[in-house]
């Protein structure tokens, strides 16, 4: 069994509550990307609207740091698509439907990454 390092920016409850209390929520993910990200790393962002400021700022920070950015989003707002190197857009406009489209996509992405690095 092999593995790649990966960090979920929503998994650290202490960081999330502390940042929400002490820092503006628009910088919630950008601060973590700044702390963890290195040139050549990849940020996978998910936003059904494509206009969530906390996600957009994380992608902006990733790009400043020389990271790659892949986005899963809906098709209405171009902001997240424009900031990302690769944007996979659901044709749906209703958030639950967009999220349903994202499920198989990130499973396929995971498998492709595993195949690339380990097979």
What are these regions (language model features)?
Residues 1-119:
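Glycine-rich phosphate-binding loops that contact phosphosugars or nucleotide phosphates
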